[in-house]
Amino acid sequence: MVLKKDIERRISELLKKMKAESIDVILSTTFENSSRNPKYLSNFSGSFAYVVIAPDKQCICSDSRYWEQIKDQSPLELVKYDRSNASHILKDLLNGYKRIGFEAKTTTISAFNDLKEKVGADNHEFVACDELINRLRMSKSTDEIELIKKAEEIAIESFVELLNEIKPGKTEKEMAAFLEYTMVKKGADKPSFDTIFGSGPNGALPHMFPTMKKIQEGEFIVIDFGAKYQGYCSDITRTVAVGEPTDEMKTVYETVKRAQIESEKIASSSLSGKEIDKVARDIITEAGYGDYFGHGLGHGLGLDVHEQPGVSAMNEDKLPQGAVVTIEPGIYLPGKFGVRIEDDIYITGETNEVLTPVSYTHLRAHET
């Protein structure tokens, strides 16, 4: 559980970064869960709020649907938003601050224009603050790690139950629904994302959502799934064999497994995302499958299922201590099958801790 001290620590760190960037105030907004930053800064999990952070003001503003929820969840001062102040509440909250930090990546053009109109563009300077908060979110606290571990536990236990349910003749949709239901039954808020479930040729589509296709004997199934617990995500992929795989399937599987193990083994705060990605990519390329591994090796994980830092050729920065990242190499042969294996790991410094201890040695459906 996220405690008051966690929120106070996050805000204290953010204020230091704001001072260094000469930002007077930050406005963090969520509308229909467009951003997880308000959750990070206030612990409020509802779908609409303005969170205002300045040296002399830390408050959360929302409408009557969420007043009691905010009182229960957040240590920040509640500012009530209603019909009487809707037209001027933002101007009141931001009055006196010159440089306003806002989330450029999740703010639509229309919302930004509306913000400038309500606050008064002539009196303020608007600067993107996304990276300030993203950098804070990369390194997880002990409490955050415990929540992620619980999300992993729920997902893993549910997956083990799923293995006994997968049989030829059942549909992809049926099996994905079983997995998602089981995760919620075991305590998840909800799935971290819509489950990816691709059997046979559908597994060659990296983000293939389940269809009414029936599972067949002799197929591989790529299952990418996760549970969300108290706002924090898990993200796991396993490739399951239904019956006996062919020699080609075994070769591809073993190649992906080796790429996964070797890149996971070296992941640490002394290496960049690019360097870790290269280890897995070189193994797959040397095996002759380089053209069939098109995505990055991994990504950060936390309140969002995809967040910083990236584990790919695009990220030349070293991974920060405290980050949780995925390691997920894959090979996808169009019209045949796909293989992906994904673990979540915690960067503890010069080493890491694997948070997803599920065997991936020739997982077989209905044989567990």
Q: What is the predicted role of each segment?
A:
Residues 1-364:
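Active-site neighborhoods and metal-handling regions in enzymes and metal-associated proteins
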